[in-house]
Every structure is written in C-alpha cells, then in structure tokens.
Amino acid sequence: MKTLPLAVPHMSQDEAEEVFGWILDGEASEEEIARFLLAMTERSETADEIAGAARALRDRLIPVEAPEGAVDCCGTGGDGHHTLNVSTAVSLVVAAAGVPVAKHGNRAASSKSGAADTLEALGLDMEAVGRTAEKTLAEIGICFLFAKNHHPAMGRIQPIRQRLGKRTIFNLMGPLSNPAGVKRQLIGIARPGYVPIYAEAKAKLGTERTYIVSGDEGLDELSLAGGNELADVCGNEFEMRRVYAEMIGLPHAPVEAIRGGDAAHNAMALKALLEGTPGPYRDAVVFNAAATLMAAGAVEDWEVGAAMAVESLDSGKANELLGKWIEMAV
C-alpha cells in the first residue's frame, strides 16, 4: 500500500498522474483517499493536478468507438443547486439535430439525481444502454457511457465520494475522460472563478474545441439567471468571454425556476419538455444546446444554434429519438 502525503502539496502533472494512479488502483486506504480528496478540495486543485489526474483515469478506461465529430455535453456536478437534468436533455436535443452525442455520466454522487438516475427513470435499462452503446451511437447518434462501465477503477472511489457528499477532483476528472475520446465538448463547472484553471487543464490535454462554462450563481451549466463565464478552448489555447441568455433572445429566469427533485421528478420534467412544455427548463436546454452545437462546429452563430435546438424540440425529433433509444437498448 502507498502512503498519501498528509500536507497534500501542489503536484506537477506527472506527480498527480502517479498519485492518482495509486488511488485508482486501490493502493491507498479509503480513509487516506477521503482525507486526501478533501484536502485538495479545500486548497483548490491546480490545472496541472487536474490534467495529471485525468491522464491517470484515461489510462485505465475501457474505450468505445465513436463517429467523427461526436460530442459530449456534461457538468461536473456538485453545484448544490439540485436543478433539473439540463445536459441530459441537451444531449437528446443535439443528437436529434444531427450531431452524434457520446454522453458520459454517472449516478448522483452529491446531488439528488445524476444523468444515469434520470435516464433509468425514463425507461432506459442501464445495463442494456452500456452493452449497446457503440450500436446506438452509430445507428441513431446517441449513447450513454455509464462511468462505472468504462472506468472500473472508479468503483472503488464512488462509495468514498458518496460518503463525503461534496465535490472533489473526481467531479473535474470525469468530463476530461470521455471513453469515446470526443474532441469537442460543452463542460459546465460549478465555480465561475475556476473556469480559467479548468480551461488550462483542458488545454494541456488538448481538444479541437471545448466550451467550459459556469453560471455566476455557481451553476455547472449556462444559466438564465445572469452572466456566465465561458472559456473557448481550441487546441492547447483558450480565450475567455462573457455570455448571456438574452443575447439569443431567451428571457431571464432565476435558478429556482429549474429546481429539480429525485430521478422520477426529473424524468417527468424531461419527458414533458420533449413533448412541448414551454418555460425556463426548455430555455435553459436551448441555451446549452446552442453552445454545444457551437462547440461541435455544427453552427457558427449562437442564434442559429438556438433555432436548431428549438426545431429539434418542436418537430418532435428529440422525443422520437428517446423512444428509439429505449427500443434499441435491450
């Protein structure tokens, strides 16, 4: 067994990769891992540490094949707002608009309902979803890459994360370790001031284009409630900008307007959204879908992306896609 450092000093990329290799391989005790993760959270992780830890996770994942141009849309979680599942809905909207989506996600660690919980409540068999991931991605343009199926080492970590009940570096590592190796993403993080650091970590790992976003309220997605930080990461560089829902004609709405509940509640809201229910949840999904389509290179203008997302919903394509997915994932 390895002994993790008590003081948790700042680490280089290589050092972080080595230490998180120990953690993922079960070479440290649960008590040491919990203490180590909390200490890192309290002092804030550096870009080198996030990139190195993500490299360790990537080295141990079980990959899947994905078509060229596949994207992912996910949040780090841990924002404490317990909103409805925006990125899950965005994945269906974007895929129905013609961009393949390799959605990477997990069950809730510190929230009430993660992507896997909500999809299961919608009628998807999680075991079948994993078994048919490459098939559904190739044939209907969407799959769900359940973290536990592709990151076996995370099985040892999940109980620790659930016991801690708060955000850790593992929230940050997951979106950087998509098993389909997507080169384009929308990633939401829960700390707006941390966007440049996370963008630097993503730039160290490389990407064709990734948008790192955070709502000013600490929301791990683009928010309707105010301003949003956005880092546009291309290759190994990034630039920062501010974006607002109003710039594409979407109305302001408080975070409380998209407050969620348990998996059954969130699944019901998502189904209603796909069936045409208007309101702040739909607006939040359109805003984030527009950003995902921009990052994917499918559109070059936010308003065009929003219109594409609206068409995906209003035409019934996103709802039809969910039905096909449920039928295929058996």
UniProtKB/Swiss-Prot annotation:
Binding site for anthranilate 2: 161
Lineage: Bacteria, Pseudomonadati, Pseudomonadota, Alphaproteobacteria, Sphingomonadales
EC assignment: 2.4.2.18
Organism per entry: Erythrobacter litoralis (strain HTCC2594)
Name of the protein: Anthranilate phosphoribosyltransferase
Catalytic function, reaction form: N-(5-phospho-beta-D-ribosyl)anthranilate + diphosphate = 5-phospho-alpha-D-ribose 1-diphosphate + anthranilate
GO molecular function, one term: anthranilate phosphoribosyltransferase activity
Top-level taxon of the source organism: Bacteria
SUPFAM superfamilies in the record: Nucleoside phosphorylase/phosphoribosyltransferase catalytic domain, Nucleoside phosphorylase/phosphoribosyltransferase N-terminal domain
Cofactor requirement: Mg(2+)
